[in-house]
Curated annotation (Swiss-Prot):
Record Gene3D superfamilies: P-loop containing nucleotide triphosphate hydrolases
Native organism: Acidithiobacillus ferrooxidans
Keywords, in A-Z order: Plasmid
UniProt protein name: Protein MobD
The keyword Transferase is annotated on this UniProt entry: no
Pfam families, alphabetized: CbiA
Length: 227
C-alpha cells in the first residue's frame, strides 16, 4: 500500500481546520514521515504560508475538475509521501461535483482516504458532513470536535445525532481536539509560523502553552492516524 491521504474538512470557515491541518503535518513529520501538503484554500492559504519553506506544498483549487485531476496525479507520483489536504471553507460544492474523481481512483492509487471532519457546535457543519459522506463513500471519516468551542459534552447536537451513529458504525471515531490559548494561535497565524518554528521562536510562556497543546493533540491524532 502507498501512504494514506488525510483530508481535513469541515466546509465552513472558522471551525479550526487550519490548526488541525498544522497539527497533522507536525505529528506526521515528528514520526519521520515524508509529507505532501495540499492547500486548497487558495483565497486564504494560511497553512501553505506557514509550511511552504519546510514541507513540499502545492496550492490546488478543488472547486474545479482540473484541481481534482491534478490532485490524483500528484498522489500517484508520490506514493511514499503521506498526503495532507487542507480543504477550503467552501469546498463541499467541489467535493459533490468532482469528488468521485478521487473516490474512484483510491483503489488504483493503493491509498486510503482518511477524513478528519472538524466541527463547532452548530448544525450546518453536521449537514455538510452528511453531504461529504454521500459524495465520497470510500473515505474513512472521523469527527473532530474543536475544543475551542467548549468541552465535549457541549457538542450536544452532534453527540446525540444519528450522524454520529452513522460515522461510528462505519468505523469512524468521534474525538475532541484541544483548545490552544488565543495568544499563541494568534502568533502562529499572524507570523505565519509552522508549529516546529514556533516552538523555537516564541517567548517561553507561549512555547510552554504550545508544547502542552501539541502533546494533547498528539494523543488525539494517535487514535486516528495509522501509517
Amino acid at each position: 500500500m502507498a501512504k494514506s491521504i488525510y483530508l481535513i474538512g469541515g466546509s465552513k470557515g472558522g471551525v479550526g481546520k487550519s490548526l488541525v491541518t498544522m497539527a497533522t503535518v507536525d505529528y506526521l513529520q515528528e514520526r519521520g514521515e515524508s509529507v505532501l501538503l495540499i492547500e486548497s484554500d487558495t483565497s486564504n492559504p494560511d497553512v501553505w504560508k506557514a509550511y511552504k519553506e519546510s514541507t513540499e506544498t502545492e496550492l490546488i483549487n478543488l472547486d474545479e475538475a482540473d484541481g481534482w485531476i491534478q490532485l490524483v496525479n500528484l498522489c500517484d507520483s508520490k506514493p511514499d509521501s503521506v498526503v495532507v489536504i487542507n480543504a477550503a471553507a467552501r469546498n463541499n460544492k467541489g467535493v459533490s461535483a468532482y469528488g468521485e474523481t478521487l473516490n474512484s481512483t483510491l483503489a488504483e492509487l493503493k491509498r486510503k482516504l482518511v477524513t478528519l471532519w472538524v466541527i463547532n457546535r452548530q448544525r450546518d457543519s453536521l449537514e455538510l458532513l452528511k453531504e461529504y459522506m454521500d459524495a465520497i463513500p470510500n473515505a474513512d471519516v472521523h469527527v473532530v470536535r474543536n475544543g475551542h468551542f467548549g468541552e465535549e459534552k457541549k457538542f450536544e447536537l452532534y453527540n446525540g445525532s444519528k450522524l454520529r451513529t452513522a460515522v461510528e458504525e462505519r468505523g469512524g471515531q468521534s474525538v475532541t481536539f484541544p483548545d490552544m490559548a488565543d495568544r499563541v494561535s494568534d502568533d502562529i497565524y499572524s507570523k505565519r509560523m509552522s508549529i516546529s518554528v514556533a516552538l523555537k521562536e516564541l517567548p517561553i510562556g507561549n512555547r510552554a502553552e504550545l508544547t502542552r497543546w501539541r502533546n494533547e493533540a498528539k494523543k488525539v491524532l494517535e487514535g486516528v492516524i495509522h501509517e
